Amino acid sequence: MIALKERIAGAFERASSYDDHAMVQRKIAQRLARRIAALPLGPAPRILEIGCGTGFLAAAAEGQIEGTDWLMTDISPAMVERSRCRFGSSATYRFAVVDGEQPAFEPAEAPFDLICANFAVHWFEDLERGLTRLFRLLRPGGTLLFSTLADGTFGEWRSAHEALGFAAGTPPYPTRETLVAMRLDGVEGSWEADRLVETYANAFDFLHALRAIGAGTPRPDHRPLSAAAMRQVMRRFEEAGASASYCVMTADYQRPHAAALP
């Protein structure tokens, strides 16, 4: 069986029309960029971005921070290359293929003043452990800022399945309560909840958009529906309005200035 991370990376490798369909990701990137601009980062901050994709977040934050050393990383070599093509002429940015859940850096790379991620950490297999690893790469006083998806995301698609006695292949996103309860080395985060709704022309358009942004990877235990069953689900989805919710949670974790954490 192909490992989940390999399937996810492969999905993003094939997401050639990502920019045309990732509307929600773009909106949240703009919001994250405004929050980054408001942080007291100081001169020449070192920034690590996890899951850079095609560069939405860096583009939204461009020009707002002076003297930045911004390391853009992604698990997908194709996405890293697209970001490199977009920003490669700038001395501000560097690029690397990295599994954000298991980051491996030379000692000279860390610590970072800011670690950020837009719509990336929900792919982690163990979210709290993965975030804790990132948190430990921060300097004292540094910030971990990220957006992720919560329970309720694509609820309309799941409801269309459940109404017919089927199970959708969408991942089981954590509840808001589970996310807010996470402590990284004992540190509590500041969380904000938001819900964005996208309406599609039809069910095929919705599924095409998911594949285009690399989000069509089903959960590992999902058994695909027959063609006839899928047509029933698509019809039900369209009858309900062909809308899909994105339940977005944005978090800010500050590493204490006090003695180094374990």
Indicate residue ranges for each PLM-predicted region.
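N-terminal, positively charged/glycine-rich alpha-helical extensions of SAM-dependent methyltransferases
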Residues: M1-S16
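Conserved alpha-helix/loop element of class I SAM-dependent methyltransferases that forms part
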Residues: M23-P43
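Conserved Class I S-adenosyl-L-methionine
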Residues: V24, T54-F56, S190-P262
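A short SAM/SAH-binding and catalytic strip from SAM-dependent methyltransferases
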Residues: D113-D126
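A short glycine-rich, Lys/Arg-flanked "PGG" loop and its adjoining helix->strand segment in the class I
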Residues: E128-P140
